[in-house]
């Protein structure tokens, strides 16, 4: 695995910022990655979200410990046919959010495979966070204690969230960004890349979009 290098950055419209953080959301299809991202960036919720095809990203600039930080947030497709495409985006990621659906035990079980993929393709310095989404649902099958236990086993922080109710959504991104900023401040991790404002979708293959429930 390669390390991350520093690049001084400023946006095209003349506004400067201290660093860019590239953050990925990964996990099985339908766990609500896109809904978490849209809730955080746009404060919107759509219960029937179009499944991500390939890669999508959004930008949000936030204040982290007094520093202006541009978050480049990448939403990856969870379907198996896109794994080769999406793993290419792990390199250079400063933070990775592993998401499962608390109403679907399979997505929880698969987190270990996602974690293995991260170890194979991401930088050693990347900060990780486990998220159990759809915590508002009464049909929960994965308990918070199970999530905590898995996070402890993997050695990473854990948060439960609901994109629908806007529970802990901001906490997810700010917690991870603060961990990254602490590494940057201690010179163990450094900002990378230049971001472009907006929402870009990269499609690949001949797969069709499909709707999935999003909470």
Swiss-Prot record:
Enumerate the GO terms in the molecular function aspect.
GTP binding; GTPase activity
Q: Which compartment or compartments is the protein found in?
A: Cytoplasmic vesicle, Secretory vesicle membrane; Cell membrane; Cytoplasm
Database matches in InterPro entries: P-loop_NTPase, Small_GTP-bd, Small_GTPase, Small_GTPase_Rab
Q: Where is this motif: Effector region?
A: 49-57
**What is the recorded membrane topology of this protein?**
Lipid-anchor
Does the UniProt entry include the keyword tRNA processing? no
Name the domain of life this protein comes from: Eukaryota
Q: Name one GO biological process term.
A: exocytosis
What are the Phosphoserine sites (modified residues) in this protein? 201, 204
Q: Which GO terms describe its cellular component?
A: cellular bud neck; endoplasmic reticulum; endosome; incipient cellular bud site; mating projection tip; mitochondrial outer membrane; mitochondrion; plasma membrane
User: Which residue(s) hold a covalent lipid per the annotation (S-geranylgeranyl cysteine)?
Assistant: 214-215
Instruction: Identify the keywords attached in UniProt to this record, alphabetized.
Output: Cell membrane, Cytoplasm, Cytoplasmic vesicle, Exocytosis, GTP-binding, Lipoprotein, Membrane, Nucleotide-binding, Phosphoprotein, Prenylation, Protein transport, Transport
The primary site where this protein sits is membrane
Among Pfam families, the record links this protein to: Ras
Q: Where does GTP bind?
A: 27-34, 75-79, 133-136
NCBIfam families, A to Z: small_GTP (TIGR00231)
Q: Please describe the quaternary structure of this protein.
A: Interacts with the guanyl-nucleotide exchange factor SEC2. Interacts with SRO7, YIF1, YIP3, YIP4 and YIP5.
**What protein family is recorded?**
Belongs to the small GTPase superfamily. Rab family.
Q: What does this protein do?
A: Involved in exocytosis. Maybe by regulating the binding and fusion of secretory vesicles with the cell surface. The GTP-bound form of SEC4 may interact with an effector, thereby stimulating its activity and leading to exocytotic fusion. SEC4 may be an upstream activator of the 19.5S SEC8/SEC15 particle. SEC4 probably interacts directly with SEC8; it could serve as the attachment site for the SEC8/SEC15 particle.
Give the protein's recorded name: Ras-related protein SEC4
Q: Which organism is it from?
A: Saccharomyces cerevisiae (strain ATCC 204508 / S288c) (Baker's yeast)
Source organism phylogeny: Eukaryota, Fungi, Dikarya, Ascomycota, Saccharomycotina
């Amino acid at each position: 695995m390669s390390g991350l290098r520093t690049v001084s950055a400023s946006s095209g419209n003349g506004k400067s910022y201290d660093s860019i953080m590239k953050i990925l959301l990964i996990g099985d299809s339908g766990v609500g990655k896109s809904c978490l991202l849209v809730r955080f960036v746009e404060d919107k919720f759509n219960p029937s979200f179009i499944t991500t095809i390939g890669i999508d990203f959004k930008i949000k600039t936030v204040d982290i410990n007094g520093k202006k930080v541009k978050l480049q947030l990448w939403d990856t497709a969870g379907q198996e046919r896109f794994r080769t495409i999406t793993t290419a985006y792990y390199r250079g990621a400063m933070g990775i959010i592993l998401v499962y659906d608390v109403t679907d035990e399979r997505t929880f079980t698969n987190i270990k495979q996602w974690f293995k993929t991260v170890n194979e393709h991401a930088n050693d310095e990347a900060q990780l966070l486990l998220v159990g989404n759809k915590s508002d649902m009464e049909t929960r099958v994965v308990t918070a204690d199970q999530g905590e236990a898995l996070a402890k086993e993997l050695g990473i922080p854990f948060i439960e969230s609901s994109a629908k109710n806007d529970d802990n959504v901001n906490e997810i991104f700010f917690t991870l960004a603060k961990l990254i900023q602490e590494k940057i401040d201690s010179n163990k991790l450094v900002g990378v890349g230049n971001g472009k404002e907006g929402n870009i979708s990269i499609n690949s293959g001949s797969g069709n979009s499909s709707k999935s429930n999003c909470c």
